[in-house]
Amino acid sequence: MTTRKPFIICDFDGTITMNDNIINIMKTFAPPEWMALKDGVLSKTLSIKEGVGRMFGLLPSSLKEEITSFVLEDAKIREGFREFVAFINEHEIPFYVISGGMDFFVYPLLEGIVEKDRIYCNHASFDNDYIHIDWPHSCKGTCSNQCGCCKPSVIHELSEPNQYIIMIGDSVTDVEAAKLSDLCFARDYLLNECREQNLNHLPYQDFYEIRKEIENVKEVQEWLQNKNAGESSLK
């Protein structure tokens, strides 16, 4: 029987980082109107693309440096993430960060941890009076949810047939990707969704837990054994 190669995708805000950076930006800089937009996204009466786009549209572009400095100082990387990335790199397990966040904070926060070509996120433009969001990874094919950064579309683009897909996330932006995964590591909003929709999942608090559980996954164990056997035969 052919071994199913593991393939890991990971959210950024609230998953790799301890808090949701977009929410913290809005709490600090946005006028009160952002709350109704957030509630619309969470209740799914607004698409993620529309809701998040309109939230950032409330912020003057003149705040670029202030917002950037704030989020880079405020964000904290979740415990065990650096070690987790080192583990998957050592064993050559495909790993991508697919984020509904913005390039001006996702890239610098992951610098030196995850290569830029393994990060998919949105682009914030500060060229006009108010921040405008560009969506370079919009929905394709059968997805019509107006995801913004469409995680299902990116998964279809990057993954190969018969891979064992592992999803790590926390929020409403991760639900559709979780439905495509063989195993979802979930917390917060996503954990409740996984329970309600009977998706195969495990809860987590940090990446030490995730690594421990991943090493117990049959497909990962088989991949590591085959890889180690191949390396031994070359010695």
UniProtKB/Swiss-Prot annotation:
InterPro entries tied to this protein: HAD-like_hydrolase_phosphatase (IPR050849), HAD-like_sf (IPR036412), HAD-SF_hydro_IB_MtnX (IPR017718), HAD_hydro_PyrdxlP_Pase-like (IPR006384), HAD_sf (IPR023214)
Gene Ontology biological-process annotations: L-methionine salvage from methylthioadenosine
Top-level EC class: hydrolase
UniProt pathway annotation: Amino-acid biosynthesis; L-methionine biosynthesis via salvage pathway; L-methionine from S-methyl-5-thio-alpha-D-ribose 1-phosphate: step 4/6
Catalyzed reactions per annotation: 2-hydroxy-5-methylsulfanyl-3-oxopent-1-enyl phosphate + H2O = 1,2-dihydroxy-5-(methylsulfanyl)pent-1-en-3-one + phosphate
NCBIfam families: DKMTPPase-SF, HAD-SF-IB, PRK09552.1, salvage_mtnX
Family: Belongs to the HAD-like hydrolase superfamily. MtnX family.
Name of the protein: 2-hydroxy-3-keto-5-methylthiopentenyl-1-phosphate phosphatase
Organism: Bacillus subtilis (strain 168)
